[in-house]
Amino acid sequence: MKGALGSPVAAAGAAMQETFGCVVANRFHQLLDDESDPFDILREAEHRRQQQLQRKRRDEAAAASGAGHRGGRSPAVASGHRPGAAGRRESQKERKSLAVSSAQQPDSPGGPQPPGQKRTPRRGEQQGWNDNRGTDVVLDRAERRSYREYRPYDTERQAESTAEKFTDEKPVDRFDRDRPLRGRGGPRGGLRNRGRGGPGNRAFDSFDQRGKRDFERYGSSDKANRMEDSMGGCGVRTWGSGKDTSDTEPPAPMEETSMMEECQGVLDEESASKVPELEVEEENQVQEMTLDEWKNLQEQTRPKPEFNIRKPESTVPSKAVVIHKSRYRDDIVKDDYEDESHVFRKAANDITSQLEINFGNLPRPGRGARGSTRGGRGRIRRTENYGPRAEVVTQDVAPNPDDPEDFPALA
């Protein structure tokens, strides 16, 4: 770390700290002298691990090949070491030579092959494991056609149908073949109308598609079949025989037809009588009228309200006596009332006509001259400023609210 303190990075950091007062870089100058790459360390560890695995596999292969020889080498050679070199490791060349010699031995046909030299199974063969011997068992099967090999759909189905017609065996081998008729849609990539219930399936109704039996369907229901069976036995609901029921049943339709004819005759008569009535009603209803006519019709049909109004008696009673005569003539009063009907009556104590009402303006308090002695706008107008106009300026006395003359009573 002493060398790190004198490094240019540390000097630059110190200069930055003095200049700006804030350093976000390596504060304690850690790992400044470390130039190794961490990925190199990981690669080296991985390489070491792979070498150990390879060495272990080679040792196991050498031990297995040494144990397979009959009366061959000594245990020192079988363990992978030469007898003269006990403390020295075996070289790579010696290991290779041991592996080649063990592979060329003719007296070990059942020995396991070294790793990396197994033969891939041929086409049509399958490898299985036998627990008794520990060797690979090869099972030959019939050669299949390639997965992507194109084959016309119609020709394939026709061949299968002809093959299954002449054989009584069940189609067990269909699980190993492609089954395009299984799902709702047809085969991938074309051939329309191959789905459920499509016309593509009608041509192949003769052969089994899913290994099941095809049942024939009839248009009649189960109830009809059961009725026929019971008729052959003891008749309908086990009463009488089939001949009895056949003899008694035909009159029923004749009675029904006669009833239907009577009902139709009654309906025709009713409809003929109703038709003119409907026509008359429609003629009465369809009448065009204006809005005024309709309103007048409504007013006529509307019930008028009746009020119990008491009427005055026009006859003068015989015992009536005139107490005093009126001061005004009736004709003058009527004329005045008709001409001045819009004028309201005045009370007897009304004195508003006797009052004198003046709308005079009171003198406004002045602001004073700008060039006043005290240098400011005055709020009170002084009389000395208006020498010749002193007689004009008159101030009325404010009205007294307690005085009835200033505030007359309003009726």
Curated annotation (Swiss-Prot):
Modified residues (Phosphothreonine): T352, T373
Residues joined by cross-link Glycyl lysine isopeptide (Lys-Gly) (interchain with G-Cter in SUMO2): K212, K274, K334
Keywords on record: Coiled coil, Cytoplasm, Isopeptide bond, Methylation, mRNA processing, mRNA splicing, Nucleus, Phosphoprotein, RNA-binding, Transcription, Transcription regulation, Translation regulation, Ubl conjugation
GO biological process, one term: ribosome hibernation
Coiled coil (UniProt feature): 42-62, 279-301
Acidic residues bias locations: 402-411
Distribution of this protein across tissues and organs: Expressed in the heart. Expressed in cardiac myocytes (at protein level).
Keyword Zinc-finger: no
Annotated spans, Disordered: 42-317, 358-411
Glycyl lysine isopeptide (Lys-Gly) (interchain with G-Cter in SUMO1) crosslink location in chain: K212, K274, K334
Keyword Cytoplasm on entry: yes
InterPro entries: HABP4/SERBP1-like, HABP4_PAIRBP1-bd, IHABP4_N
Localization per Swiss-Prot or TrEMBL: Nucleus; Cytoplasm; Cytoplasm, Stress granule; Cytoplasm, Sarcoplasm
Entry PTM: Phosphorylated by phorbol 12-myristate 13-acetate (PMA)-activated PKC isoforms at Thr-352 and Thr-373.
Name of a matching Pfam family: HABP4_PAI-RBP1
Induction note: Up-regulated in response to mechanical stimuli in cardiac myocytes (at protein level).
Residue numbers bearing the Phosphoserine modification: S7, S36, S74, S108
Domain of life: Eukaryota
GO molecular function, one term: SUMO binding
Basic and acidic residues bias: start-end ranges: 87-97, 138-181, 205-229, 292-313
List of residues that carry Omega-N-methylarginine: R70
Function: Ribosome-binding protein that promotes ribosome hibernation, a process during which ribosomes are stabilized in an inactive state and preserved from proteasomal degradation. Acts via its association with EEF2/eEF2 factor at the A-site of the ribosome, promoting ribosome stabilization in an inactive state compatible with storage. Plays a key role in ribosome hibernation in the mature oocyte by promoting ribosome stabilization. Ribosomes, which are produced in large quantities during oogenesis, are stored and translationally repressed in the oocyte and early embryo.
Domain comment, as recorded: The C-terminal region is necessary for nucleus and cytoplasmic localization. The N-terminal region is necessary for nucleus and nuclear bodies localization. Regions containing Arg-Gly-Gly repeats (RGG/RXR-box) may be preferentially methylated by PRMT1.
Subunit architecture: Associates with ribosomes; promoting ribosome stabilization. Interacts with EEF2/eEF2; promoting ribosome stabilization. Interacts with FMR1. Interacts with FXR1 and FXR2. Interacts with CHD3 (via C-terminus). Interacts (via C-terminus) with RACK1. Interacts with p53/TP53. Interacts (via N-terminus) with SRSF9; this interaction is direct. Interacts with SYNCRIP; this interaction is direct. Interacts with MEF2C (via N-terminus); this interaction decreases DNA-binding activity of MEF2C in myocardial cells in response to mechanical stress. Interacts with PRMT1 (via N-terminus).
Entry's family note: Belongs to the SERBP1-HABP4 family.
Name of the featured protein: Intracellular hyaluronan-binding protein 4
Organism whose genome encodes this protein: Rattus norvegicus (Rat)
UniProt lineage: Eukaryota, Metazoa, Chordata, Craniata, Vertebrata
